């Protein structure tokens, strides 16, 4: 067994080059993020409607979310005081700037941001520092999520010109990922990532070439700023062999999400975890999200209803997305994800990665980390 090198992000060193991907609503909170960080990986808390369990969420969701950002980080730190812990914050969410600033003030090590290009992320971080009386000893790290060399070039160029900085880390999320995907339906089809038998149809070599192209773009900006900018790949990474394949492509680490759902420490309900275990290959489908992006999820009565053209009643609007028309959206993304998080697997949206059907049991974070790193091989 070859020992994996740590993931080095400037002055932040992650012992094992495994980032646990952010999953919302309520799937990766303090328990999962803290457990992953405790085992030497990087734990990521999803900020998406993070305050959904707060008693005032429906009447004062902004304060409920801000309060929960602080609390979840505090609780994760109690689990892993020296661990690497951060937030995943979606660009498409309303009040994005507020979530970013609160994550900085809460003491996050990193913000990973996608579902749109995080053009203004550096400015919001600087605004947070300006409001803080005591600055942290180590600056927070900023990591955009990209899906192509083109999007990597755009965000690097914009941060360079606008803020005179480069990313600290770049996450390349491929077409096998779960949840919201940075691809059009046509692009997913071109990669063979939208079928009922993705393992047989997916063109891995084609996306491997794209990963290498992203690495090349990032290297150019690393050279300009005189430092190495690590690239982490995500999407469909389930085994140690998958991890090694990504590292052989030139990645510095991997981001894994789906594999951690069926662990004891995952913050999801038992019913949510069981839905993964019960799912077959043919149950994992592509759907269109109100966010305006395709998403990968488990087919259930809720999605069957949507596919059949029936629109669930939307009782209230949580103002969760920057661009959302309650009159035309197929369903409320907040309520669909909250139902799922609470265990209503018939009426909720069960986001998952392409390998969710491979889950067979409830495991532990420690075992999953050891399998991914090859320690159990």
Locate the predicted segments by residue.
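Active-site entrance/lid segments in N-terminal catalytic domains of soluble metabolic enzymes
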Residues: 1-224
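Conserved active-site-proximal phosphate/metal-binding subdomains
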Residues: 19, 177-232, 238-377
């Amino acid at each position: 067994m070859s020992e994996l090198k740590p993931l080095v992000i400037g002055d932040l060193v992650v012992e094992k080059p495994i980032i646990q991907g952010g999953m919302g609503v309520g799937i990766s909170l303090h328990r999962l993020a803290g457990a992953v960080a405790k085992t030497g990986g990087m734990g990521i808390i999803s900020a998406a409607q993070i305050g959904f369990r707060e008693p005032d969420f429906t009447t004062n969701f902004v304060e409920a979310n801000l309060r929960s950002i602080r609390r979840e980080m505090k609780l994760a730190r109690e689990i892993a005081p020296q661990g690497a812990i951060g937030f995943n914050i979606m660009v498409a969410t309303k009040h994005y700037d507020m979530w970013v600033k609160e994550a900085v003030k809460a003491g996050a090590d990193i913000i990973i941001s996608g579902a749109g290009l995080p053009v203004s992320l550096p400015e919001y971080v600087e605004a947070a520092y300006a409001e803080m009386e005591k600055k942290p000893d180590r600056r927070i790290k900023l990591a955009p999520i990209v899906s192509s060399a083109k999007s990597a070039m755009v965000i690097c160029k914009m941060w360079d010109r606008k803020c005179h900085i480069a990313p600290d880390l770049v996450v390349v999320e491929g077409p096998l990922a779960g949840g919201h995907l940075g691809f059009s339906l046509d692009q997913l089809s071109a990669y063979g990532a939208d079928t009922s038998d993705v393992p047989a149809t997916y063109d891995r070599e084609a996306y491997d070439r794209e990963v290498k192209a992203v690495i090349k773009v990032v290297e150019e900006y690393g050279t300009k700023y005189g430092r190495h900018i690590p690239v982490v790949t995500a999407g469909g990474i389930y085994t140690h062999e998958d991890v090694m394949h990504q590292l052989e492509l030139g990645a510095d680490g991997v981001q894994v999400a789906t594999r951690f759902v069926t662990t004891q420490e995952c913050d999801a309900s038992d019913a949510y975890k069981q839905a993964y275990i019960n799912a077959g290959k043919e149950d994992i489908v592509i759907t269109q999200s109100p966010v305006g992006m395709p998403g990968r999820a488990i087919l259930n009565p809720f999605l069957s209803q949507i596919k059949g053209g029936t629109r669930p009643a939307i009782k209230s609007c949580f103002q969760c997305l920057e661009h959302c028309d309650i009159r035309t959206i197929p369903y409320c993304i907040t309520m669909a994800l909250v139902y799922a998080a609470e265990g209503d697997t018939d009426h909720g949206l069960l986001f998952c990665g392409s390998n969710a059907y491979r889950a067979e049991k409830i495991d532990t974070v420690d075992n999953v980390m050891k399998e991914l790193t090859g320690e159990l091989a």
